[in-house]
Amino acid sequence: MQRIIYYLLNKFFMTEAEGEILKYFKKKDKIVFDIGCFRGNFTKNFIKNEKKLGIKSNFFLFDPNPNVKNYLKLILENTQIKYFNLALDNSNSKKKFYFNTFFEASGSSLNTVIRDDKKWKSTRKIFMQIFQPFKKIGDFAEINVQTQTLDDFCLDEKIENIDVLKMDTEGSELNILKG
């Protein structure tokens, strides 16, 4: 059942439109950040479209959930991709990180509000009605993760410009940009 849910989510909510932005780039060596990379679908689509156009970028993938690396094994063989088990945020510190135990990485966030949010509770209720046997669908685990600001990360890695910045961090996007 879990694979069917993943298939449906990817089929109807993930598109290859991300790669279309490449048509607007003239620069060959781009820096692409995939923050909240989960399974790396954005990066996979981007690379596929790059090959069609004869372009090659350097990718930096970020996700603080330790389970994510298991999903990225194949794309991490690509030398133009670097993965960081790190949460980008507005400070350099340790913070609590929440992830959905049913989907392992999907819906993970530094955003503590997510567990108490009315929208989340409403969505969870609908999921529970549809997938009654899977009572853990809305349970969250909590771990402590290292956070770093985007500015400090770029200084450490000697990155002057980010050409493409994709973020899917379940509500922490503004904090990342502030950092």
Question: Which residues does each PLM region occupy?
Answer:
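Phosphate/nucleotide-binding beta-alpha loop and adjacent structural elements of enzyme active sites
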Residues: M1-G179
